[in-house]
Amino acid sequence: ILSDLVKNGFYINQCYSMTELAGYGLLNVTQEGDHLRALGKPDGFCEVKMDETGEICVRGGCVMLGYYKNPEATAETIDKDGWLHTGDLARVDEEGYYYMTGRKKNLIILDSGENVSPEELEKLLGKCDAIKECIVKEMGKKIGTVVCCEDDKQQQVKAFVTELNRTLPMYKRISVVECSAEPLPRNALGKLLRK
């Protein structure tokens, strides 16, 4: 969609922010290629880094002082060095653009210590035409997916997962595939339920 807007003369200016930031932490003013999908680069008004888990952290004058009358929640979100932990996971390319990969609270942490972003796998599964919607989650200490597809498409979905697994590192491979013709359960906001 963004590429089409740019082709039709629209100028796209994207910002990454959240309620806990006054302003934004990342700014994307590029109008070209893959960078259109990026969250952006640090804007210079605050410091931005990724911690060891890949979580975006922001520090500076744009960060809130804390949650009103809730010091416990503040301490969980802002560390002793003043870094606000956003809960968003990202990767950074060689040009310094940040790309969202998922949410920290959704991470699947394997017994091996490896972290798997379900959103990353869901995006890959979304390339299968037979899949209407899906969710990836831990299922009995394995990575599994629940897929909404027509009954006659289940074999196509399972074949797609088999092929996808060949391209993934061993620890990211999907071991359990459950198919349902019924839409997957959602919360009141319309988001897929992970549990």
Regions found by a protein language model. Give the residues of each.
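Ser/Thr-glycine-rich phosphate-binding loops at phosphate-binding pockets of nucleotides
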Residues: 18-21, 86, 110-111, 187-189
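Short, conserved charged micro-motifs
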Residues: 152-159
